[in-house]
Amino acid sequence: MFEKITEQPSLYDRLEEKSTREILEDINREDRKVAEAVSRTIPMIERLVEQIVPRMEQGGRLFYMGAGTSGRLGVLDASEIPPTFGMPPTFVIGLIAGGDRALRNPVEKAEDNTERGWEELLSHGVNSSDTVIGIAASGTTPYVIGALREARRHGILTGCICSNIGSPLAAEADYPIEVIVGPEYVTGSSRMKSGTAQKMILNMISTSIMIRLGRVKGNRMVNMQLSNNKLIDRGTRMLMSEFDLSYEDARTLLLRHGSVRIASESMKQKPPKK
């Protein structure tokens, strides 16, 4: 019988009687277990990423799907891809049960609709070159399960991130990632360790894909969008370091070309000074 580790009683009790320091130390003690749990899933993450990269090289997209905290984390990771790596917002798409309103407020029973997730994928023109990753700590969210089931039936690559073993969601995924973090500090509050594990794994998936797709040079975000002064300053210093330019010359070069990568390529194409 399927057992929800995410619903098991906390290892701690009488929380209301603890001091602030005790609560913080307890939570930190539990959080230290998360990185260890994630490290055990690296082979699972690797297998999924190795399948995603060639699809995205051919123009495929990546969809994240979730409800509540899981959905918000998927939207968060997807929203960071354009500014960090200079990719269009349609390259990685985060979908949350209940739509954008659910990012700030709970939408009653949105996650219980088995058909809605697939309908939303269809509205984005999902096809067999794309990948759908379902995110659900429990592994039982109908919105996500229904979407993955239909995606898989239509020949679309599927993966999932969940915090229980042998969940219904994992059964619908080609490449399940089961990250077992144990009972939550507040019983059943999967926004805590499970959510932290999801965020770490999403970071690993998207960052490794972008590196494999050539969106990072050395260790630098050479394709980042220059959307604020901090990023313009960062890009300027990248060019200063690479080409021994003054700050003003590097900044002028960067703003002329609009990206570190293009500015760098323009410098390399210049004939050497005689």
From Swiss-Prot:
The active site is at E80 (proton donor), E111. The keyword Ion transport does not apply. InterPro entries: Etherase_MurQ (IPR005488), Glucokinase_regulatory_CS (IPR005486), MURQ/GCKR (IPR040190), SIS_dom (IPR001347), SIS_dom_sf (IPR046348). Residues 52-215 form the SIS domain. Pathway: Amino-sugar metabolism; N-acetylmuramate degradation. It holds the Pfam family GKRP_SIS_N. GO terms for biological process: amino sugar catabolic process; N-acetylmuramic acid catabolic process; peptidoglycan turnover. Its EC number is 4.2.1.126. One of its GO terms (molecular function) is carbon-oxygen lyase activity. Keywords: Carbohydrate metabolism, Lyase. The keyword DNA repair does not apply. It catalyses: N-acetyl-D-muramate 6-phosphate + H2O = N-acetyl-D-glucosamine 6-phosphate + (R)-lactate. A lyase-type mechanism (elimination/hydration) is suggested for the cleavage of the lactyl ether bond of MurNAc 6-phosphate, with the formation of an alpha,beta-unsaturated aldehyde intermediate with (E)-stereochemistry, followed by the syn addition of water to give product. Specifically catalyzes the cleavage of the D-lactyl ether substituent of MurNAc 6-phosphate, producing GlcNAc 6-phosphate and D-lactate. Homodimer. PANTHER family: GLUCOKINASE REGULATORY PROTEIN. Belongs to the GCKR-like family. MurNAc-6-P etherase subfamily. HAMAP family: MurQ. This is N-acetylmuramic acid 6-phosphate etherase. It comes from Porphyromonas gingivalis (strain ATCC 33277 / DSM 20709 / CIP 103683 / JCM 12257 / NCTC 11834 / 2561).
